[in-house]
Amino acid sequence: MATPDVSVHMEEVVVVTTPDTAVDGSGVEEVKTVLVTTNLAPHGGDLTEDNMETENAAAAACAFTASSQLKEAVLVKMAEEGENLEAEIVYPITCGDSRANLIWRKFVCPGINVKCVQYDEHVISPKEFVHLAGKSTLKDWKRAIRMNGIMLRKIMDSGELDFYQHDKVCSNTCRSTKIDLSGARVSLSSPTSTEYIPLTPAAADVNGSPATITIETCEDPGDWTTTIGDDTFAFWRGLKDAGLLDEVIQEFQQELEETMKGLQQRVQDPPLQLRDAVLLNNIVQNFGMLDLVKKVLASHKCQMDRSREQYARDLAALEQQCDEHRRRAKELKHKSQHLSNVLMTLTPVSLPSPMKRPRLARATSGPAAMASQVLTQSAQIALGPGMPMSQLTSVPLGKVVSTLPSTVLGKGSPQAAPASSPASPLLGGYTVLASSGSTFPSTVEIHPDTSSLTVLSTAAMQDGTTVLKVVSPLQLLTLPGLGPTLQNVAQASPAGSTIVTMPTAAATGPEEHTATIEVAAVAEDHEQK
């Protein structure tokens, strides 16, 4: 159907419904009402309300807060997908000479690494946008990005712009907003700025006609405001005049106390619940208690710093004491080693005395020498029958040997005669032991059965005055007639020799009595000299 080329300008309010899914995955769709002003150019016929597609009209809260300082309007892109219309809210931003658009629906907390900036048909994060713009040296990306010539941080600190659904989705690591109690926020009664920005042909066509869309912003009713209407002021003044304001304040106080009491009980059990975090955030924002939170943090930080310094000083003192103890231990160890070395040098090494082999000494002349040799004797040896002469070689030197007759030895242990006995003459101050009552016979017969026994003269043995000598290691002699015999013994006996008496039984007839000297036992009698 042909239509005349007539352009008719008219402004209408179009309600556009945009399904929006919550970020937290609750699946609840929010309906946003966007007030737009359209500039329609139909090609014919009268335009009525039937030509405008208005579906799912609903009244809802505004999507965001707009600043009176934002001179540039917010661009809304309309995309038609089937029968549904979806609106995209973007903010033009700059960083240096680079320009981009901030997609508000994707601008979620904390925002620095969230891909929410459309730059040359690519969606990147604000951090990447700052790097591409050559402002990577700036530490704060919110100061590097500007919106209408104003730093993004200043806009967000004043509360004019916040993250998308920040009251529902917060990372607890953001430092983007500060509570503004100075009245910098735009009140509900403040005028809103609107500007007409034409959309691209591919992006927006309403009923087949190009449209210019603007958004009328409104302030969130929950924000802190410093200006109220006359009716509101009259309401509270009426409560005051009626005397009910005190009761209302008491109810407020009781409700707040119960809320804080329950909150205090719940925060004792970790972890912190989401509703408690939301409650704390609302209390801080609505009552301006952020400074109190900062005060608590600053006090705790100061206390921790003091404790850390004290611990550092204590640790340094302990390390110094440890070093001192180690040094003293080394000194004591060195002194101990030095003293040990000194003691080793002063203490003589005790070596075992070598065993002296017995040796024969030449006999010296004179009774004095004989007596000096006999004085060294310290024990006595008893001779008895039953042992040959060859065993006399095992008798140790320096012993006094006595012989007893077989009649005495057979009866029991031999008894030594006292030193005053006439049968026991003295030899060099020592007693020569013999049996009591025995006499020295005139004839003694010796049977030499070893090479160490030598009979000097058998004829001399008959008169009882000749000394019989055992060459080595023992000597044998007779004692009757102590005249020149002792002199000969002193000359012939070596040092350390043994003096032996050979008593025999008394003779009763003309037979010859013989005695054989044998070792019956060896007994040492330790006497004090």
Curated annotation (Swiss-Prot):
Top-level taxonomic group: Eukaryota
Cross-link Glycyl lysine isopeptide (Lys-Gly) (interchain with G-Cter in SUMO1) per UniProt, renumbered positions: 154
Single Gene Ontology BP annotation: regulation of transcription by RNA polymerase II
InterPro entries: SAND-like_dom_sf, SAND_dom
Cross-referenced Gene3D superfamilies: SAND domain-like (3.10.390.10)
Residue ranges of every copy of the SAND domain listed in the record: 80-162
Residues noted as binding Zn(2+) in the record, renumbered to the chain: 109, 166, 170, 174
Modified residues (Phosphoserine): 372
Chain segments annotated as transmembrane: none
PROSITE patterns linked to this entry: SAND (PS50864)
Disulphide bond pairs: none
Alphabetical list of SMART domains matching this protein: SAND (SM00258)
Coiled coil regions in record: 244-347
Pfam family, any one: SAND
Keywords: Coiled coil, Cytoplasm, DNA-binding, Isopeptide bond, Metal-binding, Nucleus, Phosphoprotein, Transcription, Transcription regulation, Ubl conjugation, Zinc
Cell location: Nucleus; Cytoplasm
Placement of covalent cross-link Glycyl lysine isopeptide (Lys-Gly) (interchain with G-Cter in SUMO2): 154
Residues engaged in binding DNA: 135, 139, 142, 153
Gene Ontology, cellular component aspect: cytoplasm; nucleus
GO molecular function, one term: sequence-specific double-stranded DNA binding
Known partners and oligomeric status: Homodimer, and heterodimer of GMEB1 and GMEB2. Interacts with the glucocorticoid receptor (NR3C1). May interact with CREB-binding protein (CBP).
Functional note: Trans-acting factor that binds to glucocorticoid modulatory elements (GME) present in the TAT (tyrosine aminotransferase) promoter and increases sensitivity to low concentrations of glucocorticoids. Also binds to the transferrin receptor promoter.
Protein name per the record: Glucocorticoid modulatory element-binding protein 2
Organism, scientific name: Rattus norvegicus (Rat)
Gene this protein is translated from: Gmeb2
